[in-house]
Amino acid sequence: MTDFQFSKVEDAIEAIRQGKIILVTDDEDRENEGDFICAAEFATPENINFMATYGKGLICTPISTEIAKKLNFHPMVAVNQDNHETAFTVSVDHIDTGTGISAFERSITAMKIVDDNAKATDFRRPGHMFPLIAKEGGVLVRNGHTEATVDLARLAGLKHAGLCCEIMADDGTMMTMPDLQKFAVEHNMPFITIQQLQEYRRKHDSLVKQISVVKMPTKYGEFMAHSFVEVISGKEHVALVKGDLTDGEQVLARIHSECLTGDAFGSQRCDCGQQFAAAMTQIEQEGRGVILYLRQEGRGIGLINKLRAYELQDKGMDTVEANVALGFKEDEREYYIGAQMFQQLGVKSIRLLTNNPAKIEGLKEQGLNIVAREPIIVEPNKNDIDYLKVKQIKMGHMFNF
């Protein structure tokens, strides 16, 4: 269906809140499947029968870690060999059920799982409902239907559990696009992607918190160092702030990705150390600005992998080819954490110090107002000139040489 448009995440959340079933699909390079999803609090016989009739797949009950611990739901196997490490627990039936398989009895089991008074001894093992334990951090950690189900229930203000069921076509194969789209239209059912849900959470969830603020005298001048910690990963970042940000408008700013080799060792394989020095100098001269120092070593692949990439470059690859050879994208960085740090600092609009167009787009996608790009001007050397040319040619970096 060429004219099909996915639903808004807000509409999907509202449908979940109202007890309706929605359709969610994952990435093409993952399972590439659509699942029915609803909240466990609305695991009615009607909803379960609909999933069994039209979905035909296994009806599961994604739950949070807290619920799994409370009810003593243990992993189904000691060593998980599932292709996507889906966290099945031992299957269960509620003790008030008979065989446990009918839509009515599966409804009882699912709803009792989210009963505030439920306890481990209320369930027989094995059974006909299949709890799945969602990863802490949800779809931002694992892009699966398990995590999408629990995230959607949480965002709807409901208990952190739900139902999901894969959708098969009439011939027994898994239903894919455009048949999933056609089904959603025919049944007036909200249809979203896990990628949409990830993007929604990056914009709306509070994913970083400020820990401390201290004076930081540097060789460039005196700054205030604001420390931040990511809520999900525990990764630590720093914002170096100069001057008064009260109005938050047109702040001279830079997002600088950590580069131990360039920033601390003075490596000439890259221009990172020079860019950091240039940005600090410009902000000091302006008397007002922010540098976010993010823990994104090696364009997000980490220090050891960056050094492995250097090893491949010494054998003839360029910086992009080396990253790809190691199984990474040319640039693994995300900018939603940086955008949230700017927001917590009261920054409303920025003049961004960067030569990287992807950084501009990444911040704009998070709703940050970039009123101007300020180039970072550094002189190439004999050791990094080829690296800089590759970034210019293959990654679109805006250099003037």
Curated annotation (Swiss-Prot):
Q: Which domain of life is it from?
A: Bacteria
What Pfam families does the database record attribute to this sequence?
DHBP_synthase, GTP_cyclohydro2
One GO cellular component term noted in the UniProt record for this chain: cytosol
- Kindly list the residues the record flags as site (Essential for DHBP synthase activity): H128, E166
Q: In which pathway does it act?
A: Cofactor biosynthesis; riboflavin biosynthesis; 2-hydroxy-3-oxobutyl phosphate from D-ribulose 5-phosphate: step 1/1; Cofactor biosynthesis; riboflavin biosynthesis; 5-amino-6-(D-ribitylamino)uracil from GTP: step 1/4
The entry marks the following residues as binding GTP, namely R254, I255, H256, S257, E258, Q275, E297, G298, R299, T319, T354, K359
Listed under catalytic activity are: D-ribulose 5-phosphate = (2S)-2-hydroxy-3-oxobutyl phosphate + formate + H(+); GTP + 4 H2O = 2,5-diamino-6-hydroxy-4-(5-phosphoribosylamino)-pyrimidine + formate + 2 phosphate + 3 H(+)
Enzyme Commission number, as recorded: 4.1.99.12, 3.5.4.25
Key words of the record: GTP-binding, Hydrolase, Lyase, Magnesium, Manganese, Metal-binding, Multifunctional enzyme, Nucleotide-binding, Riboflavin biosynthesis, Zinc
Cofactor field: Mg(2+); Mn(2+); Zn(2+)
Please explain the role this protein plays, according to its UniProt record: Catalyzes the conversion of D-ribulose 5-phosphate to formate and 3,4-dihydroxy-2-butanone 4-phosphate. Catalyzes the conversion of GTP to 2,5-diamino-6-ribosylamino-4(3H)-pyrimidinone 5'-phosphate (DARP), formate and pyrophosphate.
Q: Per the similarity annotation, which family is this?
A: In the N-terminal section; belongs to the DHBP synthase family.
Q: What is this protein called in UniProt?
A: Riboflavin biosynthesis protein RibBA
Q: Which organism is it from?
A: Actinobacillus pleuropneumoniae serotype 5b (strain L20)
Gene name, Swiss-Prot/TrEMBL: ribBA
